[in-house]
């Protein structure tokens, strides 16, 4: 039986690359389009209650988190609520959740790579928001 894989945020560059590379290996993704106003706790609840994938890759706000020049604190707050709900839903439905991380959760003073075992020390609003996500 094949795993049901869901990709939130399939419209961004990384999402498109995953879909393309997956297709080359005969890996298909459920890639739902977000609501007009973006994913929120209610729409995520409905989506996961209806689809129940085995694993979910969350790139829903990838552009805002990693590429956009300016993102307001209000946008980050709304995204944080959505990601918290997504994590709760995945835990409740026993869905594996993959969430990209970022170097921005560290202070950047090291010359070598950081690992998930390092103590986070985010700088700026974006780094602090990413650490909470």
PLM segments and residue spans:
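Conserved Rossmann-fold NAD(P)-dependent oxidoreductase catalytic core, especially the SDR/UDP-sugar
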Residues: 84-123
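NAD(P)H-binding glycine-rich loop region in Rossmannoid oxidoreductase-like domains
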Residues: 41-80, 89-91
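Active-site Tyr-X1-5-Lys
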Residues: 121-133
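Adenosine-cofactor binding site in Rossmann-like domains, unifying the SAM/SAH pocket
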Residues: 23, 27-47
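N-terminal Rossmann NAD(P)H-binding glycine-rich loop of SDR-like oxidoreductase domains
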Residues: 2-24
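Glycine/Thr-rich phosphate-binding loops of Rossmann-like dinucleotide-binding domains
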Residues: 15, 65-66, 106-108
């Amino acid at each position: 039986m094949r795993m049901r894989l869901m990709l939130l945020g399939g419209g961004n560059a990384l999402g498109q690359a995953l879909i393309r590379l997956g297709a080359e290996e005969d890996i298909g993704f459920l890639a739902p389009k977000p609501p007009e106003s973006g994913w929120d706790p209610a729409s995520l609840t409905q989506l996961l209650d209806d689809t129940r994938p085995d694993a979910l890759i969350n790139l829903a706000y990838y552009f805002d988190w990693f590429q956009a020049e300016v993102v307001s604190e209000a946008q980050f707050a709304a995204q944080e609520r959505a990601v918290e709900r997504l994590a709760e839903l995945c835990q409740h439905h026993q869905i594996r959740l993959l969430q990209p991380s970022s170097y921005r959760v560290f202070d950047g003073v090291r010359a070598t790579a950081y690992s998930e075992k390092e103590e986070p020390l985010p700088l700026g609003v974006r780094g602090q928001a990413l650490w909470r996500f």
